[in-house]
């Protein structure tokens, strides 16, 4: 019986790196952010263009323009999620079906808003990636194009880290470097029966 792992963590916590560590241990990983970026170049385009006119260019969603629309009216986030989340779920289900056919012991869904979207009900175990708030802030503000305002807007839409940790089956502390995180990933897989 395949175990579906849901990986989550607030922005700048080291989730992408941790997902790579699971992949290096042979776990198939689906990155929900990458799925969304793909949808922004494919089937979500006409739906987003209809909901938010002027946010697409040359058959692709212009993420800058879409971001401006969302910042002007945060209620638009819900409308966008109503469009995108079902499409993402379809991709996740196809990914999990393939992993089952391939007789994998584990499959990992990397879902930034796992708790916020109720996705924990679709996974067997939840792993939360966390680190100290000052490390998180430093990581995020060093990203190209990131501002304090954008960071605060993203944080406001995410469940507080302490609550995520409390609801997790496992927590990976990414604040002590990649090798320490790798050891934690291996330990989680051992506990789950790898």
Curated annotation (Swiss-Prot):
One Pfam entry name: CoaE
Binding, ATP: 12-17
Coiled-coil region: none
One record GO biological process: coenzyme A biosynthetic process
Ranges where the DPCK domain occurs: 4-194
Keywords: ATP-binding, Coenzyme A biosynthesis, Cytoplasm, Kinase, Nucleotide-binding, Transferase
Name of the protein in its database record: Dephospho-CoA kinase
Annotated organism of origin: Agrobacterium fabrum (strain C58 / ATCC 33970)
Lineage: Bacteria, Pseudomonadati, Pseudomonadota, Alphaproteobacteria, Hyphomicrobiales
Gene that produces this protein: coaE
